[in-house]
């Protein structure tokens, strides 16, 4: 019997999961790594620490599954997107810490590009907005601020990649420098219509083409692991950015199907088929996956801070000891007591796109308790999701039938019920909640014939629980109206 290994490299931890043919998790390992905050608004990772943590959990997950590396049929990779790494091709060493997707250091550069009237150019070609969130301006910053980097890049000595590229480079012992189309579509450098790096956008951001990875399909055999890592050469066969992998793992394979992932951030994607739909409401158009010559697209809304707000309660305020305690604390009060948290710790993402927004806690009175703050924190995740869905339904001109959910915070029943109440549609939690890793596993397995086709994996999806809306629609509208007032007060707070 053989198995599929999925590498799930996230914003706060590296994970590895072993799946069997029925999509069951046989072994799982996870390791957190450092979050580096050099200044307010700046977020970095040590890329070498990411690699070490990822390799460590791979070995641990295989051991926990009770198998050997020789039993692995294929490896799939899913990753935090946009996070930018540049390394020396000869030594394999990064020239700087990785700049994380949450980092806002290039807000001024985005403003300058916008002032030149270039927003429509980037928007129409990439499906993205000009925002520090994406990789392009991060890469330009590294080339401009690391001594000698630009000259070395132009000489072909440096390699750029998102985290998937960094992992593949290391897994193959430096033999392969590549990224899949879903990750490439998050860089501000990739033309989603042509399916290739865009020469004009590269010129606008002063990016030498020699630094870029090869763009490949999301499901194909890219190469094999170097034998020194796992005592076996295992095919690396599937890659997708974390949110696209979750869309695939949730079997949202028909236009109009929507999933929302509740992780560090919160990310909603709607499958739109083979036609890229450009949003009129500040959503993103992105590549969902590339299978052979077929490219599928999605509309996306990205919330920067979701589960990270709960981590702030734990690490910043110290009102909970573990993230799981937030549900009990929030349940200690009957409602939010008029308290609203806008967790704009790294600005606001879709549909607002305000890099200068900052976090705000509003409605506090002498009677406000830790329970009210905990409840407001959970509710902020649902409010941001509701803003996304409203914009998405308008762009697609199609009302949502159900919302499929995944990610760590979906274990929080209070949050899921409030989400259904606020949206007025069923919220469906799948039996296998590890849908991001599962999507990467499916992509890898399809490449080597472990699963025959999407119809076969489609039969594996099952709902574990459906949360039906129970709140009066007038009450939901009232709550959302107050949320909007709070949102307005957080916007434009930081100085450009």
Swiss-Prot record:
Family label: Belongs to the FGGY kinase family.
InterPro entries: ATPase_NBD, Carb_kinase_FGGY, Carb_kinase_FGGY_CS, FGGY_C, FGGY_N, Glycerol_kin
Annotated pathway: Polyol metabolism; glycerol degradation via glycerol kinase pathway; sn-glycerol 3-phosphate from glycerol: step 1/1
Record-listed ATP binding positions: 11-13, 264, 307, 311, 408
Residues noted as binding ADP in the record, renumbered to the chain: 11, 15, 264, 307, 408, 412
EC assignment: 2.7.1.30
Regulation: Inhibited by fructose 1,6-bisphosphate (FBP).
UniProt keyword Transferase present: yes
Catalysed transformations (reactions): glycerol + ATP = sn-glycerol 3-phosphate + ADP + H(+)
Binding locations of glycerol: 81-82, 133, 242-243
MF-aspect GO terms: ATP binding; glycerol kinase activity
Source organism of this protein record: Geobacter sulfurreducens (strain ATCC 51573 / DSM 12127 / PCA)
Described function: Key enzyme in the regulation of glycerol uptake and metabolism. Catalyzes the phosphorylation of glycerol to yield sn-glycerol 3-phosphate.
Protein name: Glycerol kinase
GO terms, biological process: glycerol catabolic process; glycerol metabolic process; glycerol-3-phosphate metabolic process
Binding-site positions, sn-glycerol 3-phosphate: 11, 81-82, 133, 242
Keyword set, alphabetical order: ATP-binding, Glycerol metabolism, Kinase, Nucleotide-binding, Transferase
Nucleotide-binding keyword on record: yes
């Amino acid at each position: 019997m053989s198995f599929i290994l999925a590498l799930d490299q996230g914003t706060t931890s590296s994970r590895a999961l072993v799946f069997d043919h029925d999509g069951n998790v046989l072994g799982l390992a996870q390791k957190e790594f450092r979050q580096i905050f050099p200044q307010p608004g700046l977020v970095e990772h040590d890329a070498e620490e990411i690699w070490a943590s990822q390799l460590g959990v791979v070995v641990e997950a295989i051991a926990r599954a009770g198998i050997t590396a020789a039993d692995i049929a294929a490896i799939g990779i899913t990753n935090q997107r946009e996070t930018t790494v540049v390394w020396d091709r000869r030594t394999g060493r990064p020239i700087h810490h990785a700049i994380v997707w949450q980092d806002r250091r290039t807000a001024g550069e985005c403003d300058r590009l916008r002032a030149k009237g270039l927003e429509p150019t980037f928007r129409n070609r990439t499906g993205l907005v000009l925002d520090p969130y994406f990789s392009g301006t991060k890469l330009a910053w590294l080339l401009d601020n690391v001594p000698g980097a630009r000259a070395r890049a132009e000489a072909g000595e440096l390699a750029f990649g998102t985290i998937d590229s960094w992992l593949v480079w290391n897994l193959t012992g430096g033999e392969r420098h590549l990224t899949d189309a879903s990750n490439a579509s998050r860089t501000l450098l990739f033309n989603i219509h042509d399916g290739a790096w865009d020469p004009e956008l590269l010129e606008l951001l002063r990016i030498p083409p020699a630094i870029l990875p090869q763009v490949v399909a999301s499901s194909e055999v890219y190469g094999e692991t170097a034998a020194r890592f796992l005592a076996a050469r295992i095919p690396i066969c599937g890659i997708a950015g974390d949110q696209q992998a979750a869309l695939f793992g949730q079997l949202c394979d028909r236009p109009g199907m929507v999933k929302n992932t509740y992780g560090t951030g919160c990310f909603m994607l709607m499958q739109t088929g083979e036609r890229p739909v450009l949003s009129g409401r500040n959503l993103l158009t992105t590549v969902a996956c590339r299978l052979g010559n077929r490219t599928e697209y999605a509309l996306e809304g990205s919330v920067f801070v979701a589960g990270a707000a709960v981590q702030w309660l734990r690490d910043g305020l110290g009102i909970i000891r573990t993230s799981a305690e937030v549900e009990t604390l929030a349940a200690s009060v009957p409602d939010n007591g008029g308290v609203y948290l806008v967790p704009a710790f790294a600005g606001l993402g879709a549909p607002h796109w305000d890099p200068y927004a900052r976090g705000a806690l509003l409605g506090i009175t002498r009677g406000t308790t830790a329970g009210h703050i905990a409840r407001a924190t959970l509710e902020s995740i649902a409010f941001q999701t509701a803003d996304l869905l409203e914009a998405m339904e308008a762009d697609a001109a199609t009302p949502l039938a159900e919302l499929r959910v995944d990610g760590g915070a979906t274990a929080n029943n209070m949050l899921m019920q409030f989400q259904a109440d606020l949206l007025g549609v069923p919220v469906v939690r799948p039996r296998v909640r590890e849908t991001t890793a599962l999507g990467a596993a499916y992509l890898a397995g399809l490449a080597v014939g472990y699963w025959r086709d999407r119809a076969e994996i489609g039969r594996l999806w099952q709902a574990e629980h459906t949360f039906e809306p129970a709140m009066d629609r007038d009450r939901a509208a009232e709550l959302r109206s107050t949320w909007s007032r709070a949102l307005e007060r957080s916007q434009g707070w930081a100085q450009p």
